[in-house]
Amino acid sequence: MADALTNAITTTLWPFLKSEGFQKVTPRKFVRQRSEVFQQLWVDANGSGGSKRTCVVLCASLPFGPVHGYMDPHGSRIANGRAWNMATPESAANGMQQVVEVLQSHELAKLDVISDVEKLLGLLENLPNRNWHSTYSQLHQRWRDKDPEALALEQANRVALKLA
């Protein structure tokens, strides 16, 4: 699966993402910045539902929050969690082409809509667990106030995502 998937990412997904302004962080993780938000896409090839399938994950990360992993509401699997079969070169190529089509048609646009710090904080406010909003609001205020720790976290995130 890995060779077929790696080839499909290299020949199909990466050229598209590069044209959209993404940078390669690892062979399966890509990032770009929109407004002050870090947009990430990565290919999760760990399987899904006990089968050897691949998910593609998109997320918008606040510059002063965690940038590893994804959390609602600013992280999601594209195409409503669809998993693609990457077992053969043909299925991997077909799967990555479908991923590109989904990204082109609506997924990147949906990500762009929430790629604003205030908008992301507003989405967190609507979650049942109010701790998310409280925690991020405090971090946001420290970041806006140019608190040295908050700025250091943003810089560390930039380095981790190869945006520095």
Regions inferred by a protein language model and the residue ranges of each:
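Amphipathic alpha-helical segments
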Residues: 2-24
